[in-house]
Amino acid sequence: MDYKQALKYYPDFPIKGVNFVDIIPFLQDKALFRSLVDDIAAVCASPNIVAPEARGFLFTAPMLYSGQAENVIPVRKKGKLPFSEGDLVTVEIQKEYGKDQVFYRLSDLASCKPVGDIIPLTFFDDILATGGTARGIVESLNGKTVTIDGKQYPVKVTDYVFLVEIDDLPGRRNIEDLAPVTSLIHVTEN
């Protein structure tokens, strides 16, 4: 299916010089959305998905319902994720339009399904532009170890999956040293 036709573009949003790729039209067509979620699930190498808010949630949560994923680990903006002492991990990221912080919980990682001797994760996000968000989160996750049923498991992001990759931006080059990259739709910025 040619998903590219469903995308909408907004120049100079959210700031001048950034061209926004809008994926919301996928939510307005049930058959298209279902097909897209199935295609995303088919390329995810892990049963555990890590997804930054909020659009990443839109495409990964249905995978839980359908049994195509075991767990979705949310990565949230500041003030959006309740936590216990020592549970919250802060990640510094470089976005296309500035620096930011995002957060995830170690307890969410401990709810993942181990495969062999690791906790494998697929990183999913809607857009790959510069790769700053993806790189920051994956570098942080790959350094973690969680205990499940008394056994320690290292966390390893096995792959990146993106709905849309902007091919003329350096995103892929900036992250592919950490894990293989799959993108369902390829566009150019201009």
Regions found by a protein language model. Give the residues of each.
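Short glycine-rich phosphate-binding loop at a beta-alpha junction
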Residues: 46-54
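Short Gly/Thr/Asp-enriched flexible loops that form oxyanion-binding sites at enzyme active sites
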Residues: 58-67, 137-139
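PRPP-dependent phosphoribosyltransferase catalytic core
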Residues: 5-6, 139-190
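Acidic, divalent-metal-coordinating active-site segment for phosphoryl/phosphodiester hydrolysis
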Residues: 125-138
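Short, glycine/charge-rich flexible loops or terminal/linker lids adjacent to PRPP-binding catalytic cores
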Residues: 70-122
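Active-site-facing substrate-recognition patch
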Residues: 1-45, 102-110
